[in-house]
Amino acid sequence: MPMDEIAATDPVAILREIEESCRVCNTTDSRQAIEIFSEWSGIAFRIGRNRLLAPLDEVVEILDMPKLARVPLAQPWVRGIANIRGNLLPVVDFSGFLGGEVATVTEKTRVLVIDYDGIYSGLVVDEVFGLKHFMESEHADAAPDVDGFLLPYIRNRYRRDGRVWCEFSLFALADTPQFLQTAI
């Protein structure tokens, strides 16, 4: 009996027909191989010439550069404190902290906010490109082409369109004792 006729007559018959269709689809003869791909997602950003990825679960929020209150007697890489919806957010110059050149603030400058093990902090980056997804097949063993001061925090690399993207662990950065030593 065609499905149209069943629908017009008996709802229980409709359910039986659906169940039978599912049974047919699940037989070994009609099964199709399903490939499951492992995907990794991260926030793509830039520090100087370095294009990096932050694991998605390590970034709480991405902000435009907020207004900052200066912190006296702080390291030069401490940009200041921002009031974000009633929460005080210490803002650190990402590159400056790692020994690189202090970032120049432009309209593309963003702040990556982390909240790790009691450390709530913002990291100034030159630019954020957005969310990137990489398949397991895009994992690369190539040596990272990034400034040396970033190397201790590089976890994985992915190749796409001739470019190698390096996964940078913001949590590993926040775990360093120097990150908490903000006073001069």
Say what each PLM segment does:
Residues 1-184:
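An acidic, low-aromatic, low-complexity terminal/linker signal
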